Swiss-Prot record:
ATP binds at K269. PANTHER family: CYSTEINE--TRNA LIGASE, CYTOPLASMIC, CYSTEINYL-TRNA SYNTHETASE. Zn(2+) binds at C28, C209, H234, E238. GO terms for biological process: cysteinyl-tRNA aminoacylation. Its cofactor is Zn(2+). The keyword Amino-acid biosynthesis does not apply. The keyword Cytoplasm applies. Monomer. SMART domains: DALR_2. NCBIfam families: cysS (TIGR00435). This is Cysteine--tRNA ligase. It comes from Dechloromonas aromatica (strain RCB). It holds the Pfam family DALR_2.
């Protein structure tokens, strides 16, 4: 029985889909004007794990993760670069896909771009206006009248009075209330614009997700996810828009992953501790990064540091050592097995990947103790459920080697030379070769079956 922590209700709830055995899930994706950073990596990996587990549990899942390809930052960056918005966004969408693929993130079923759904946005704004929840201001913008929606604040737990008193609200004399937010921005010279009943302009950020989700998943669907930073105001505003326009419940379960911190500080460009996925992957294997993200519960803060990534690498290495030393015939899962049952129980408890990975370590210990190929198959199979342990052990353990200028063939030849030196009892030469390989970031493992190597 799957339980999900529902941010809307502030408690874990048994998951009951709207339609039996079908799940419709929407996750807020990237704004594509720059490279993806570690915060994006966490969103991608966490909800990929959710997607995988829902499918493994037998659900027919429709997963939508949007792309924001029009907003102020995109326009500003395109102007700075002297290129079109399409050139900029297409380039960074391609980079985003490269990063996601490296991290083992499966493509969503739908990946809508905001600019492709402007008619749906206009339709939604029209409904809001007809329902008395939207108005055109003197500056030409169309705004949402927040105080006219009775349920505003139910996701974030913020009252309108608290927001007015405690939040930094942008002062805009054209708004009826400082808390109102823009649905349609009046066109400015040199900016992209679409025709609308309220004049040429472009959509506000919040209306984009309401329109895309309702078009692809319907007005009422099961799960909406995203980073904790989006809970307010973005997701709060989505609820106001969607429920205000369609007069029905919007989403049953809201999921939010925790923040990423760097050495216990908030990650930000101003602090100089801002890391893109690409920067991290120059130093660490992509599966290590995925493992690092999943080793923490998705709602917990995730503290990035080189030391924590090194520890994650050593931990993942140990799982691959078990698969290397007791090769599985194939990935196979017997769900009646005790380890498989506890693995499933962890993921059914609000997608507790931390607990599931703990079961993998217990299973690996049994693989090592019993030398059981059957348990090795189970280890590989369970790891694959959450996108881990899907490579050949040698490919993983030798990945990243060559930092000292040695390719795979050169390493193989040096191992042959070392074996010959040992056979000739030239132990000084054998030790010299081992030390040279170690200096190049390569560790040798001797066993009765021969010598294998891995990166340090």
């Amino acid at each position: 029985m799957l339980k999900i922590y529902n941010s809307l209700k502030r408690e874990k709830q048994v998951f009951t889909p709207i339609e039996p055995n079908k799940v419709r899930m929407y996750v807020c994706g990237m704004t594509v004007y720059d490279y993806c950073h570690l915060g994006h990596a966490r969103v991608m990996v966490v909800f990929d794990m959710v997607y995988r587990w829902l499918k493994a549990s037998g659900y027919d899942v429709t997963y939508v993760r949007n792309i924001t390809d029009i907003d102020d930052k995109i326009i500003k960056r395109a102007i700075e670069n002297g290129e079109t918005i399409q050139q900029l966004t297409n380039r960074f969408i391609a980079f985003m896909h490269e990063d996601a693929d490296a991290l083992g993130v499966q493509r969503p079923d739908y990946e809508p771009r905001a600019t492709e759904y402007v008619p749906e946005m206009l339709d939604l704004i029209g409904k809001l206006e007809a329902n008395g929840l939207a108005y055109q201001a003197s500056d030409g913008d169309v705004n949402y009248a927040v105080r006219k929606f009775p349920g505003y604040g139910k996701l974030s737990g913020k009252s309108l009075d608290d927001l007015r008193a405690g939040e930094r609200v942008e002062v805009d004399s054209a708004k009826q209330d400082p808390l109102d937010f823009v649905l349609w921005k009046h066109a400015k010279p040199g900016e992209p614009a679409w025709q609308s009943p309220w004049g040429d302009g472009r959509p506000g950020w919040h209306i984009e997700c309401s329109a895309m989700s309702s078009k692809l998943l319907g007005q009422h669907f099961d799960i909406h996810g995203g980073g904790q930073d989006l809970q307010f105001p973005h997701h709060e505003n989505e609820i106001a828009q969607s429920e205000g326009a369609n007069c029905c419940n919007f989403v049953n379960y809201w999921m939010h992953n925790g923040f990423v911190r760097v050495d216990n500080e908030k990650m930000s460009k101003s602090l100089g501790n801002f890391f893109t996925i690409r920067t991290v992957l120059e130093q660490f294997d992509a599966e290590v990064v995925r493992f690092f993200i999943l080793r923490a519960h998705y709602r917990s803060p995730l503290n990035y540091s080189d030391a924590h990534l090194d520890d994650a690498r050593r931990s993942l290495d140990s799982l691959y050592f078990a698969l290397r030393d007791v090769p599985p015939a194939a990935a196979d899962i017997d769900w009646s097995n005790e380890f498989a049952g506890r693995f499933a129980a962890a993921l059914n408890e609000d997608f507790d990947s931390h607990g599931a990975i703990a079961v993998l370590f217990e299973l690996a210990a049994e693989v090592n103790r019993q030398k059981s190929a059957g348990l090795s198959c189970l280890l590989k199979g369970l790891g694959g459920v959450i996108g881990l342990l899907e490579r050949e052990p040698s490919a993983y353990l030798q990945g990243g080697a060559g930092v000292g200028g040695l390719d795979e063939a050169a390493v193989g030849q040096m191992i042959v030379d070392r074996a010959a030196a040992k056979k000739a009892k030239n132990f000084a030469e054998a030790d010299r070769i081992r030390d040279e390989l170690k200096a190049a970031g390569i560790i040798l493992d001797d066993s009765p079956q021969g010598t294998t190597w891995r990166r340090a």
